[in-house]
């Protein structure tokens, strides 16, 4: 999801030039001083730039309560109703492969919750809609040996995990819609994970795989020092134990 503010060495892609960055910083300051209309214009421009910014500086711009778009790769391939697949594998009784149409036909749950990035920015009262992860797990049948769930992305790199108890929370969705329509590609669509009570790095974008495992498998950012349990307000997102 999104995947939150990777470092330059972890996120390949075409760099944003120094002049562009300086210009954006100036424009961001103007947006704060120039009112809501200019601010909206900046948000429209900065979103597409942010997804391929290896410097991370775009995430620091004062663009208001809006999403910043990050990817830990140079970008994910696009998927739509014709080629999207979600595989449920691992310690399950029945492996499943769901198309986008399959997921859309299932009972949908609506939530209005904030999205909090570990880097500090927040988008309040986002409208989310999708299939409860617990419903998908029940449909596949969870083996008694399973204690955790691992998620993979069709960007080919990103992964995340939850304990089985966390995954069964009513506010954890396999999201098909957010804000005011289908989840867009930049937001991690057509299907992404949304873990309401945790920082955004736990909400895997471009979701392609759900695997039941016997133990928690640390995800992309956990291998880079982030907490496995990314509860908003109970963790700063970083693992503070220097021995870990």
Residues covered by each model-derived region:
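N-terminal secretory signal peptides
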Residues: 1-16, 30
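Mixed-charge, low-complexity segments
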Residues: 3-6, 24, 243-244
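Structured, non-membrane catalytic/scaffold regions adjacent to prosthetic-group chemistry
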Residues: 12-17, 36-244
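Hydrophobic membrane-insertion alpha-helices, especially the h-region
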Residues: 23-35
